[in-house]
Curated annotation (Swiss-Prot):
The gene is thiG. The active site is at residue 111. One of its GO terms (biological process) is thiamine diphosphate biosynthetic process. It catalyses: [ThiS sulfur-carrier protein]-C-terminal-Gly-aminoethanethioate + 2-iminoacetate + 1-deoxy-D-xylulose 5-phosphate = [ThiS sulfur-carrier protein]-C-terminal Gly-Gly + 2-[(2R,5Z)-2-carboxy-4-methylthiazol-5(2H)-ylidene]ethyl phosphate + 2 H2O + H(+). It is an enzyme of class 2 (transferase). GO terms for molecular function: thiazole synthase activity. InterPro entries: Aldolase_TIM (IPR013785), Thiazole_synthase_ThiG (IPR033983), ThiG (IPR008867). 1-deoxy-D-xylulose 5-phosphate binds at residues 172, 198-199, 220-221. Residues 258-267 have a biased composition (Polar residues). This is Thiazole synthase. The lineage of its organism: Bacteria, Bacillati, Cyanobacteriota, Cyanophyceae, Synechococcales. Keywords: Cytoplasm, Schiff base, Thiamine biosynthesis, Transferase. Belongs to the ThiG family. The keyword Metal-binding does not apply.
Length: 273
């Protein structure tokens, strides 16, 4: 199992502290056992659960609630499958009840997804903002999934969201950080944690997001659909730790020309022979 990140550098969301900055999902795994092992080896402390799929017993979600140790893992219910704000609000309420059934009575977290387009799976900015405003008023800790739109991120922060979760690229695409420039702007301006969500395909991309200054990443498809999900989960966990350490250490400034790493004084010249 990967050791979690430095305990002196916790991730704080909604007043709750997490020592691991990798969030994972529960969908698309080849088996429940594969999911369990992946969660364990990633060292993650928060996993997202699709409320609708658990409620309906969708493929891959039967027995999910019993398969995870909810005394150790914080549940992040999500509103996947919701196409408008009204649906998302209803499913968020069900998600809160689901967390209570898992023994997390004080869990008001919700990963807000409003996605009307089933082909491209891009989030609806207007519906997301509408649902976020309503859910914050109901006492939810809202983690909204959004396009990498700096202005929308700012507005969601203003209405009281606990994080913003810009996508790197479309869900499940494995295209990496196609929106790196906008994500960098969001990170620069945000006063809440920025969690890069969707599109990460390999550990180097998770590390890249962390090196940019993201507070965390959420990775599901890249782990669940890997040839060896538990090994990929461990690799992602290590990449997130490395990326965070690199960001905290401060990178070498970029220069327009070379700079010798060896001293240029005291060199032996031809005259010294």
């Amino acid at each position: 199992m990967v050791s979690t990140s430095n305990g002196s550098d916790p991730l704080t969301i909604g007043g709750r502290l997490f020592s691991c900055r990798l969030l994972t999902g529960t969908g698309k795994y080849p088996s429940i056992n594969s999911m369990q092992s992946s969660i364990e080896r990633s060292a993650c402390e928060m996993v997202t659960v699709a409320v609708r799929r658990v409620q309906t017993g969708a493929a891959g979600h039967t027995g999910l609630m019993e398969a995870i140790d909810w005394s150790r893992i914080w549940m992040l219910p999500n509103t996947a499958g919701c196409t408008n704000a009204e649906e998302a609000i209803r499913v968020a309420r069900l998600g809160r009840e689901l967390a209570k059934l898992a023994g997390q009575e004080d869990n008001n977290f919700i990963k807000l997804e409003v996605i009307p387009d089933s082909r491209h799976l891009l989030p609806d900015p207007i519906g997301t903002l509408q649902a976020a405003e309503a859910l914050v008023k109901e006492g939810f800790t809202v983690l909204p999934y959004i396009n990498a739109d700096p202005l929308l991120a700012q507005r969601l922060e203003e209405v009281g969201c606990a994080t913003v979760m810009p996508l790197g690229s479309p869900i499940g695409s494995g295209q990496g950080l196609n929106n790196a420039a906008n994500i960098a702007l969001i990170i620069e301006n945000a006063t809440v944690p920025v969690v890069v969500d969707a599109g990460i395909g390999v550990p180097s991309e998770a590390a890249q997001a962390m090196e940019m200054g993201a507070d965390a990443v959420l990775v599901n498809s890249a782990i669940a659909l890997a040839g060896d999900p538990p090994s990929m989960a461990e690799a992602m966990g290590k990449a997130v730790i490395a990326g965070r350490m690199a960001y905290s250490s401060g990178r070498l400034p970029r220069r327009g020309q070379a700079s010798a790493s060896s001293p240029t004084t005291g060199l032996i010249s031809g005259k010294d022979k």
